[in-house]
Amino acid sequence: MPALDLIRPSVTAMRVIASVNADFARELKLPPHIRSLGLISADSDDVTYIAADEATKQAMVEVVYGRSLYAGAAHGPSPTAGEVLIMLGGPNPAEVRAGLDAMIAHIENGAAFQWANDAQDTAFLAHVVSRTGSYLSSTAGITLGDPMAYLVAPPLEATYGIDAALKSADVQLATYVPPPSETNYSAAFLTGSQAACKAACNAFTDAVLEIARNPIQRA
């Protein structure tokens, strides 16, 4: 795989809880209208978060839980654990299944990490969410429907790339995830027009590729 090839993620496990146990629902702090849960794991956390946001736009569901697992998919407790667990909550199993279907479609065909080099040892994500759903807009603290540049890379690459992205276009920093995260990456959510978010993604990509080509730049 040469640099910039997509790294397609996979769903590792999925189940529907048609009617959540009342005690469990209280423990999860579910609102009364959430009666069913969709559980899904995949081997790419950030792609799965974007897919979960897509589900909120296509079905009557909410993301009631979403967390990355420590140290990434390669170090999970089982092959089915993947890198992240998402719980979609909905009023009934049909809506939850519709949300899971939307997630699967996006995980298999939507946003994806890319290799920054031919050695395939450095991956990054620079993706424009053209219209945020309830999950990402709430996470980033932006207005529902606003575009977002979703940027992820290893710590130094992300730090350098986020600065380059912010300087490249009329975008604002909505959320910054400093290193180390659960998977030892760093990330940022930038907001602005779709065109500005695309320009920011391009600048971020260029910065990450520059470091991949020449990691140590002497003053």
UniProtKB/Swiss-Prot annotation:
<feature type="site" description="Important for gating">
    <location>
        <position position="70"/>
    </location>
</feature>
<comment type="similarity">
    <text>Belongs to the EutL/PduB family.</text>
</comment>
<feature type="domain" description="BMC circularly permuted 1">
    <location>
        <begin position="1"/>
        <end position="113"/>
    </location>
</feature>
<dbReference type="GO" id="GO:0031471">
    <property type="term" value="C:ethanolamine degradation polyhedral organelle"/>
</dbReference>
<keyword id="KW-1283">Bacterial microcompartment</keyword>
<dbReference type="InterPro" id="IPR009193">
    <property type="entry name" value="EutL_PduB"/>
</dbReference>
<feature type="binding site">
    <location>
        <position position="113"/>
    </location>
    <ligand>
        <name>ethanolamine 1</name>
    </ligand>
</feature>
<dbReference type="GO" id="GO:0008270">
    <property type="term" value="F:zinc ion binding"/>
</dbReference>
<comment type="pathway">
    <text>Amine and polyamine degradation; ethanolamine degradation.</text>
</comment>
<feature type="region of interest" description="Part of the acidic patch lining the small pore">
    <location>
        <begin position="45"/>
        <end position="46"/>
    </location>
</feature>
<feature type="site" description="Part of the acidic patch lining the small pore">
    <location>
        <position position="53"/>
    </location>
</feature>
<feature type="binding site">
    <location>
        <position position="46"/>
    </location>
    <ligand>
        <name>ethanolamine 2</name>
    </ligand>
</feature>
<dbReference type="InterPro" id="IPR044870">
    <property type="entry name" value="BMC_CP"/>
</dbReference>
<feature type="site" description="Important for gating">
    <location>
        <position position="184"/>
    </location>
</feature>
<feature type="binding site">
    <location>
        <position position="157"/>
    </location>
    <ligand>
        <name>Zn(2+)</name>
    </ligand>
</feature>
<feature type="binding site">
    <location>
        <position position="45"/>
    </location>
    <ligand>
        <name>ethanolamine 1</name>
    </ligand>
</feature>
<protein>
    <recommendedName>
        <fullName>Bacterial microcompartment shell protein EutL</fullName>
    </recommendedName>
</protein>
<comment type="subunit">
    <text>Homotrimerizes to form a pseudohexamer. The trimers form a two-dimensional array about 37 Angstroms thick.</text>
</comment>
<dbReference type="InterPro" id="IPR037233">
    <property type="entry name" value="CcmK-like_sf"/>
</dbReference>
<dbReference type="InterPro" id="IPR000249">
    <property type="entry name" value="BMC_dom"/>
</dbReference>
<feature type="binding site">
    <location>
        <position position="83"/>
    </location>
    <ligand>
        <name>ethanolamine 1</name>
    </ligand>
</feature>
<keyword id="KW-0479">Metal-binding</keyword>
<dbReference type="InterPro" id="IPR030983">
    <property type="entry name" value="EutL"/>
</dbReference>
<keyword id="KW-0862">Zinc</keyword>
<feature type="domain" description="BMC circularly permuted 2">
    <location>
        <begin position="114"/>
        <end position="215"/>
    </location>
</feature>
<feature type="site" description="Part of the acidic patch lining the small pore">
    <location>
        <position position="83"/>
    </location>
</feature>
<dbReference type="GO" id="GO:0046336">
    <property type="term" value="P:ethanolamine catabolic process"/>
</dbReference>
<comment type="function">
    <text>A component of the bacterial microcompartment (BMC) shell dedicated to ethanolamine degradation. Two crystal forms have been seen; a form with a closed central pore that has 3 very small (1.1-2.2 Angstroms) channels per trimer lined by acidic and aromatic residues. A form with a large central pore (8-12 Angstroms) has also been seen; this is probably a functional pore which allows molecules to enter and exit the BMC in a selective, gated manner.</text>
</comment>
<feature type="binding site">
    <location>
        <begin position="183"/>
        <end position="185"/>
    </location>
    <ligand>
        <name>ethanolamine 1</name>
    </ligand>
</feature>
<dbReference type="GO" id="GO:0005198">
    <property type="term" value="F:structural molecule activity"/>
</dbReference>
<dbReference type="GO" id="GO:0042802">
    <property type="term" value="F:identical protein binding"/>
</dbReference>
<dbReference type="Pfam" id="PF00936">
    <property type="entry name" value="BMC"/>
</dbReference>
